[in-house]
């Protein structure tokens, strides 16, 4: 229960920061996708299920506050969490290369899907322009921010795991 509450608090703080403070560190009107970083980080640290749930939670918050339709970002976040969680067992947690790389690739795919679905409904199809001027710069910015945010989430996860391990030891029958 502690883990769920902690992740919910992290997602709410992210929502507030993304809509306030991060607006002041824009570069050419681009901000890092911190929700995506949280989803991928939690997926790598905890696996597919918790990554999917985190993705759904982050996405539903984005849908409620920023989206035009309920469920779109929730579905995207869930899928990102699931696929990033598949790498959970295949890497050394203290190595930042995989989270940064997945955040870069994830941002490119995520924003491409957002563009393609938006283009489908709006009829705007200049993908190359969008890729060069928005998707790739945002992916780079997201990857850079991932170094800091992953470290924070890593230590939060580590504290929760130690607390859970301690509780299991207290209540185990010998």
Describe the residue ranges of each PLM region.
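Terminal, non-globular segments
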Residues: 1-174
